[in-house]
């Protein structure tokens, strides 16, 4: 009798083990997730200067080659023309220290940090208080989403190799979003309706685990079709990176008045930021015109 009981218990244990093995990676064990620790800087493409562009494989400016509609192609051209005169173009909100939001924050003007937990993956922009939450707890989309800069993200980890380890994070981010948004500092525009959808596949490189990919597909009414870019990041070699504070407002010398941006000089005077700029309206300021 005891032998039959022991045999039955062993059979149940074996069946359980086989079930766990066949089910692939188990979400209850962090050891089954990729090691994303460290500071991740944007991948610098040789010959392109390492600028903080959205598509790192294309030249700066119009060379980004986003499939813009004619209306939004003109928005980009007007933005670049304004920047050529010293202005900010569509980048004005970010220049005034508004949060970058999606997808600009993934350009990684400062290194990114990925914090993986069982139910949420956090993406932090180094040196600032700007971050994303990607919920991986199996939730559905809420009926109402509050407007935000980063959007609302739901994802899931996938074991593509069937080896019991998660290796790809798939995520979708929806709005409504806040503010006038751009892909990067060129002013490459997203639609002003703020209803973009971003779909991502985040994974370590198969050959070099110190390279991280983020395939971002953008669905936006400023585009003629969905646009996919494979953004890459390089893990810094420091095993214990220091994360120092670096808030935009502490280093900016720009001041917005109405729809104009001016420089604040060292002696506290408002100075023009581009050619042919009208003087600031100082009726409510104690400053002599200059």
Predicted regions and their residues:
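PEST-like low-complexity, intrinsically disordered acidic/proline/serine-rich tracts
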Residues: 24-290
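Bacterial N-terminal signal peptides
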Residues: 10-21
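Bacterial N-terminal signal peptides that target proteins for export
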Residues: 1-12
């Amino acid at each position: 009798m005891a032998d039959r009981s022991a045999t039955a218990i062993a059979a149940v244990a074996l069946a359980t083990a086989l079930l766990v093995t066949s089910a692939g990676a188990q979400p209850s064990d962090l050891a089954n997730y990729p090691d994303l620790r460290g500071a991740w800087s944007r991948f610098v493409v040789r010959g392109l200067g390492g600028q903080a562009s959205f598509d790192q494989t294309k030249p700066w400016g119009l060379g980004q080659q986003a499939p813009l509609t004619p209306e939004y192609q003109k928005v980009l051209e007007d933005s670049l023309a304004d920047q050529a005169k010293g202005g900010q173009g569509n980048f004005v909100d970010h220049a005034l220290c508004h949060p970058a939001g999606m997808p600009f924050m993934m350009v990684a003007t400062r290194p990114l940090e990925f914090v993986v937990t069982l139910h949420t993956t956090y993406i932090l922009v180094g040196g600032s208080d700007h971050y994303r939450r990607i919920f991986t707890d199996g939730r559905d989309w809420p009926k109402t989403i509050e407007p935000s800069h980063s959007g609302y993200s739901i994802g899931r980890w996938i074991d593509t190799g069937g080896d019991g380890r998660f290796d790809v994070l798939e995520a979708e981010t929806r709005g409504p979003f806040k503010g006038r948004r751009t892909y990067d500092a060129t002013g490459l525009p997203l639609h002003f309706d703020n209803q973009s959808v971003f779909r991502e596949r985040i994974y370590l490189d198969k050959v070099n685990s110190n390279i991280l990919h983020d395939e971002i597909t953008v669905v936006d009414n400023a585009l003629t079709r969905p646009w996919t870019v494979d953004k890459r990041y390089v893990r810094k070699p420091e095993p214990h990176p220091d994360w120092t504070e670096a808030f935009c407002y502490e280093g900016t010398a720009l001041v917005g008045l109405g729809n104009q941006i001016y420089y604040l000089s060292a002696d506290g005077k408002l100075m023009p930021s581009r050619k042919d700029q009208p003087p600031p309206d100082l009726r409510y300021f104690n400053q002599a015109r200059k």
